[in-house]
Amino acid sequence: MSTEPRHPQVPVGPLVASIGAVLVIVSLFLDWYDQITGFTVFEFIDLLLVMLALATIASLVGGLGLVRSAPSPGVALGVAIFTVLIVASQLVNHPPAAAGEGGPSKDIGIWLALAGSGLMVVGAVLGYARISLAVEARRRSDEP
């Protein structure tokens, strides 16, 4: 057994991807098209995006060692790319609920979802590098 103190490590890739996943979930509460939120405009895609985001957050939980097994980096990358494709498809092809003359204007929610899904991809790619931050607690010295 090693007598060295063990420093908790935070995996950078899953952390970045999880921040992106939270942005995707938050974006669904915001307007995607002309005062229509993501949860209002979609029938199934909103639930799919939430499930993909939660799967990404599960990779962080696994990387922190809070559950037994973490999803492989390949699965995390596949989930992230699928999320980007779904969000990008909504930029190109508007859902029927948002269709109208000349098409609806895009609002902050869709752009936040695109940024969040992009962060998910960046985090999944960083997950392959297995970069982590070590956290070390030090005592304060009594002398100024």
Q: Which positions does each model-derived feature cover?
A:
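Compact integral membrane and secretory-pathway proteins
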Residues: 1-144
